Swiss-Prot record:
Cofactor(s) the protein requires to work: FAD
Annotated GO MF terms: 2-hydroxyglutarate dehydrogenase activity; L-malate dehydrogenase (quinone) activity
Name of the protein this chain belongs to: Probable malate:quinone oxidoreductase
InterPro entries per record: FAD/NAD-bd_sf, MQO
Pathway the protein takes part in: Carbohydrate metabolism; tricarboxylic acid cycle; oxaloacetate from (S)-malate (quinone route): step 1/1
One protein family per Pfam: Mqo
Keyword Oxidoreductase: yes
Biological process terms in GO annotation: tricarboxylic acid cycle
Signal listed as a keyword: no
Reaction equations catalysed: (S)-malate + a quinone = a quinol + oxaloacetate
Organism per entry: Clavibacter sepedonicus (Clavibacter michiganensis subsp. sepedonicus)
Keywords of this entry: FAD, Flavoprotein, Oxidoreductase, Tricarboxylic acid cycle
EC number assigned by the record: 1.1.5.4
Similarity comment: family membership: Belongs to the MQO family.
Length: 492
């Protein structure tokens, strides 16, 4: 421990939705704990939490087909129900914060937006019908609708059917109670709350090194990128919620739990329109079906996004490759993350995921016209003059060692925590932000086992279904969802 270092209870590395959520949970549970946040950029929520960088918002598995795979003729809904349950916990915590006055004006970060799935062709329509039948029997999905009638689809999302071939077989599902979430706005609100209650935010501060002190605390060396000065801090607990930057920092920590992990960075692009005439004809998040053999991140979707009170449409994502782990990261990020302990898992992933590599190459080589044709498959009336391309954020998929294959590519998030609970970090991507609350609850349970029993009562007050399933009593499920919808000013 350094004599010159400031001592704090908690350091949060990264100013995104994960750090903001964990900090808010801790501040609600332990108001007297000291918290410092270090963000390398000049504002919070500028990387994956930024709404224009976030590939999917309001994830609740209502419309994403990759969460309901079909095996041996049976639709598996386990992933979908689990993710929806997790999203309900996030909603409950946000509703608590709104009720408590900690997060004002819910419409500034969450808005009612129907979630739809749209498919073309007889075979895909039959699959969608089977998926609908499987999900509708579950209490969290029983309000879902299905149709193959173009007139009904037109009433739900006109742009999907205008000027479409009348002989084409199409089908869609809709869940009217879906949402669009601006995680950038929510992050800012949570950070404001933390600062109002004593937390310190340090912008333009990059954590360059961390090491464990003899007393079990962590010593962090932080560079102020404005004055090029160095700040030293000792913390009892460190959370690394730095998006793609989490892997290198966890590696620097030297904890054995990070061994065998690597990161596979994937960039993305969108077509975006702000034209009010076009935007007015589409109020939904509409997900399609990925081409056979394509990875989950290739699922096309036409999204309504509400940012700063203004509504736009996004279509994509079109994947690409960049070795950066952050949108404003270094071209050396991927190569600098290679270690003797993760080189074999990384090579195994490359060998077993040639279809992903082929897909990324095809996306990189695709012309703007070819990419726009994919939008026209969704929206036949799309005109290039109304749309412009934007670059999305970086997604760093988890690569981890595997006893059988040597290494596997994991689509999802993973908490990596030291055995003593003194440090933890979050790796991975989707469903990400939408499940921030249950992910951070997992961090609390793993890192503060001696405190969790005493926290259970306040956690249950904030999140009524903490430790239980919203769908465990189907008769109560609608009431639970209705209560959060009313507080968050959502339709239900």
């Amino acid at each position: 421990m350094s004599d010159t270092a400031e001592s704090v209870d908690v350091v949060l590395v990264g100013g995104g939705i994960m750090s903001a959520t964990l900090g808010t949970l801790i501040k609600q549970l332990e108001p007297d704990w000291t918290i410092q946040i270090f963000e390398r950029l000049g504002e919070v929520a500028m990387e994956s939490s930024n709404p224009w960088n976030n590939a999917g918002t309001g994830h609740a598995a209502l419309c994403e087909l990759n969460y309901t795979p079909e095996k041996d003729g049976k639709i598996e809904i386990g992933s979908a129900t689990r993710i929806n349950e997790q999203f309900q916990l996030s909603r409950q915590f946000w509703a608590h914060l709104v009720t408590a006055g900690a997060v004002p004006e819910p419409k500034e970060f969450i808005n009612p937006t129907p979630h739809m799935t749209f498919v073309r062709g007889k075979e895909n329509a039959e699959y969608l019908r089977r998926r609908f039948d499987a999900l509708r029997a579950h209490p969290l999905f029983d309000a879902m609708e299905y149709t193959e009638d173009p007139a009904v689809i037109h009433s739900w999302a006109p742009l999907l059917v205008l000027q479409r071939d009348k002989d084409e077989v199409i089908a869609a599902t809709r869940f009217e109670g879906g949402t669009d979430v601006d995680f950038g706005a929510l992050t800012n609100k949570l950070v404001d709350y933390l600062m109002e209650h004593g937390a310190a935010l340090h912008l333009n501060h990059e954590v360059r090194g961390l090491s464990k002190n003899a007393d079990g605390t962590w010593h962090l060396r932080v560079r102020n990128d404005v004055g090029r000065s160095t700040v030293e801090v000792d913390a009892k607990f460190v959370f690394i919620g730095a998006g793609g930057g989490a892997l290198p920092l966890l590696q620097k920590s030297g904890i054995p739990e990070i061994k065998g992990f690597g990161g596979f960075p994937i960039s993305g692009e969108w077509f975006r329109t702000d034209d009010p005439e076009i935007v007015a004809k589409h109020r939904a998040k509409v997900y399609g079906k990925a081409a056979i053999g394509s990875p989950p991140m290739s699922v096309p979707h036409l999204d309504t996004r509400v940012v700063g009170g203004e509504t736009s449409l996004l279509f994509g994502p079109y994947a690409g490759f960049s070795p950066r782990f952050l949108k404003k990261g270094s071209l050396l990020d991927l190569f600098a993350s290679i270690r003797p302990h993760n080189i074999i898992p990384m090579l195994a992933v490359a060998k077993d995921n040639m279809s992903l590599i082929k897909y990324l190459v095809s996306q990189l080589l695709a012309s703007k016209e070819t990419k726009f044709d994919a939008l026209r498959e969704f929206m036949p009336t799309a005109d290039p003059k109304d749309w412009y391309q934007v670059t999305a954020g970086q997604r760093v998929q988890v690569m981890k060692k595997d006893a059988e294959k040597g290494g596997v590519l994991q689509f999802g998030t993973e908490v990596v925590a030291a055995a003593d609970g003194s440090i933890a970090g979050l790796l991975g991507a989707s469903p990400g932000a939408s499940t921030a609350v249950p992910i951070m609850l997992d961090v609390l349970e793993r890192c503060f086992p001696d405190c969790i029993a005493g926290w259970k009562k306040p956690l249950t007050r904030m999140i009524p279904n903490y430790g239980t399933l919203v769908a465990s009593d189907p008769k109560k499920t609608p009431k639970i969802i209705r209560e959060t919808a009313e507080v968050l000013e959502l339709q239900h």
